[in-house]
UniProtKB/Swiss-Prot annotation:
Pathway the protein takes part in: Amino-acid biosynthesis; L-leucine biosynthesis; L-leucine from 3-methyl-2-oxobutanoate: step 2/4
An example molecular function term from Gene Ontology annotations: 3-isopropylmalate dehydratase activity
Keywords tagged on the record: 4Fe-4S, Amino-acid biosynthesis, Branched-chain amino acid biosynthesis, Iron, Iron-sulfur, Leucine biosynthesis, Lyase, Metal-binding
Family, similarity comment: Belongs to the aconitase/IPM isomerase family. LeuC type 1 subfamily.
Protein task: Catalyzes the isomerization between 2-isopropylmalate and 3-isopropylmalate, via the formation of 2-isopropylmaleate.
Protein name: 3-isopropylmalate dehydratase large subunit
Details of cofactor binding: Binds 1 [4Fe-4S] cluster per subunit.
Subunit structure: Heterodimer of LeuC and LeuD.
Enzyme Commission code(s) on record: 4.2.1.33
UniProt keyword annotation of Lyase present: yes
Organism whose genome encodes this protein: Bacillus cereus (strain AH187)
Positions of [4Fe-4S] cluster binding: 337, 397, 400
Length: 464
C-alpha cells in the first residue's frame, strides 16, 4: 500500500518511539513571537539551559504591536512582552525581526516570504495558526508554551501521529469567490470538530489552479476544523515561490528532487475522505461565534437548533431568517495571518478603486509584513485605499485579536478577513463576521454585506 503525504513527512523526522506509541520528532524550524515565549525562555534560564539550535529558530514581534503608532506602546503588559522577547533573543542568540526591521511582520506571513518555510520541513510555533505553512508541503502545527521550551532546549518534540484526512477540491471558482469561501463552506458543512485527530490534506484540480497565497489561506484555517495541521503537496508553484528568497536553499537541484517526492501515492488510502465541488460555491459570511456558523451570501440566517445557536444569535444581535444583506457593518478589517498578503490587498484594492467607504464605517488595511507593505506601496495600493477612505497601517496582527489598540467597540459589527469570530475576539462585546478580502472591501463601501459575484470589478489593478 502506498504512503500518504503525512506518512512521508512524519517518517522523515522520527528520532525515536517510546513505549506509549509517541514519536520524538526532529523540528526543522521553530518560529517564536512575544506572547507564548516568555515563560519558555525563563524555563531555560532557571534550568541553566541554552537554545539548542538558534540557527533553526526565528522570532518576530506581531501580536502586541500598535499598527498606527508602532513605537507608542502604552499597554504595560504588551510592552513588557515585547521588551522581554528582545532581551531573550539577545541572551540566547535567536534571530529577531524587531519593530521597524525590514523582516518584521506576522509570524505566519514572514516565514514563507523570507524562505524560512520550505517543503518537507517540520515547523512549530506557539501559535494556533502555524498550519499556514503546510501550504508548502511542510508539517506545521501550533504548540503550547511548555512545548516551546522543549523545542528550544532539544529541537525535538514528542507527538502522537494523527490520522490523515483527504479533502479533494474539484471545479473552478466563480469570479468573486475565493479560498476563504472554500474553508468557510467546509466548516459550515462539517463543523469545527471534523478534523479532530487528523491532518487535513487538500488536493485536486482546484488546488492545482490556486496560487500559493490562496493555499496558505486554506491551510491557515484547518485548525478551525479541529485539525492538527493542513497540508498541500508541493508542486512547481511551490518551488517557484520559495526559490530566490533570502533564507531559501541555494542547492535547488538537490532540494527539488526531495521536495517532489512529497505527495500522496496513487494507491494510498486516507483515513477519512471528503470531496467538494466548488463550481457553484458562493461568497460566505459567518453570522455566529465560531467559524462553522456561516452561510452563503444568498442564504438567510439559519433557525436555532440548540443552546449554542441561541447564545450566538443573542451575542451577535441577529435573528434566524434574517438576510445577510441586512447585517450592519460598522468596521472593516483587512489583515491577519489568513488574508494580509499582497494578493489579498490587490483583490481588496480592485473592489474599492475609485469608490468611497460608506459614511460611518471605519475601515483598516493592515499588511501582514513590512515586505508586503513595501510591495503594496510600490504598486500604489496605499493611495487607492486612502483615497477610498481606508486607514493604511503598519504590519502586525492588529484587529484579529484584542491584544493591541486595534479593537472593535462593544456591540458593533466588523467584516473581518481574520480566522476567528469567538465572543470578544476583537474586543469586549465585538461582533465579528469572517469573510474574504473582496467581501470585506465591498462591505466597507455599502455598510452591509453584498454579493461580490455581482460587483462590477475585474479583480485586477492597472498600475499604469
Amino acid at each position: 500500500m502506498g504512503k500518504r503525504l503525512l506518512d512521508k513527512l512524519w517518517e522523515r523526522h522520527v528520532v525515536a518511539t517510546n513505549e506509549n506509541g509517541l514519536d520524538l520528532l526532529y523540528i526543522d524550524l521553530h518560529l517564536v513571537h512575544e506572547v507564548t515565549s516568555p515563560q519558555a525562555f525563563e524555563g531555560l534560564r532557571l534550568t541553566n539551559r541554552t537554545v539548542r539550535r538558534p540557527d533553526l529558530t526565528f522570532a518576530t514581534m506581531d501580536h502586541n504591536i500598535p499598527t498606527k503608532d508602532v513605537w507608542n506602546i502604552t499597554d504595560r503588559i504588551a510592552k513588557q512582552q515585547l521588551d522581554t522577547l528582545r532581551e531573550n533573543c539577545k541572551q540566547f542568540q535567536v534571530p529577531l525581526a524587531d519593530i521597524g526591521d525590514e523582516e518584521q511582520g506576522i509570524v505566519h506571513v514572514i516565514g514563507p516570504e523570507l524562505g524560512l518555510t520550505q517543503p518537507g520541513k517540520t515547523i512549530v510555533c506557539g501559535d494556533s495558526h502555524t498550519a499556514t505553512h503546510g501550504a508548502f508541503g511542510a508539517l506545521a502545527f501550533g504548540i503550547g508554551t511548555s512545548e516551546v521550551e522543549h523545542v528550544l532546549a532539544t529541537q525535538t518534540l514528542w507527538q502522537r501521529k494523527p490520522k490523515a484526512m483527504g479533502i479533494e477540491l474539484k471545479g473552478k471558482l466563480q469570479k468573486g469567490v475565493y479560498a476563504k469561501d472554500i474553508i468557510l463552506h467546509l466548516l459550515s458543512k462539517y463543523g469545527v470538530a471534523v478534523g479532530t485527530g487528523y491532518v487535513m490534506e487538500f488536493y485536486g484540480e482546484t488546488i492545482q489552479a490556486m496560487e500559493m497565497e490562496e493555499r496558505m489561506t486554506l491551510c491557515n484555517m484547518a485548525i478551525e476544523g479541529g485539525a492538527k495541521a493542513g497540508i498541500i503537496a508541493p508542486d512547481e508553484k511551490t518551488v517557484a515561490y520559495v526559490k530566490g528568497r533570502k533564507y531559501a536553499p541555494r542547492d535547488y537541484e538537490t532540494f527539488e528532487k526531495k521536495w517532489f517526492e512529497l505527495y500522496t501515492d496513487a494507491d494510498a488510502i486516507y483515513d477519512l475522505h471528503i470531496s467538494i465541488d466548488v463550481t457553484d460555491l458562493a461568497p460566505y459570511v459567518t453570522w455566529g461565534t465560531n467559524p462553522s456558523m456561516g452561510v452563503r451570501i444568498d442564504e438567510k440566517l439559519p433557525e436555532k437548533h440548540d443552546v449554542n445557536d441561541e447564545r450566538a444569535f443573542s451575542y451577535m444581535g441577529l435573528s434566524p431568517g434574517q438576510s445577510t444583506y441586512d447585517i450592519p457593518v460598522q468596521h472593516v478589517f483587512i489583515g491577519s495571518c489568513t488574508n494580509s498578503r499582497l494578493s489579498d490587498l490587490e483583490i481588496a484594492a480592485a473592489v474599492v478603486k475609485g469608490r468611497k467607504v460608506k459614511e460611518g464605517v471605519r475601515a483598516l488595511v493592515v499588511p501582514g509584513s513590512k515586505r508586503v507593505r513595501d510591495a503594496a506601496m510600490q504598486k500604489g495600493l496605499h493611495h487607492i485605499f486612502e483615497e477610498a477612505g481606508f486607514e493604511w497601517r503598519e504590519p502586525g496582527c492588529s484587529m484579529c485579536l484584542g491584544m493591541n489598540p486595534d479593537q472593535v467597540p462593544e456591540g458593533e459589527h466588523c467584516a473581518s478577513t481574520s480566522n476567528r469570530n469567538f465572543e470578544g475576539r476583537q474586543g469586549k462585546g465585538a461582533r465579528t463576521h469572517l469573510v474574504s478580502p473582496a467581501m470585506a472591501a465591498a462591505a466597507a463601501l455599502y455598510g452591509h454585506f453584498v454579493d461580490t459575484r455581482k460587483e462590477s470589478y475585474d479583480g485586477a489593478i492597472s498600475y499604469s
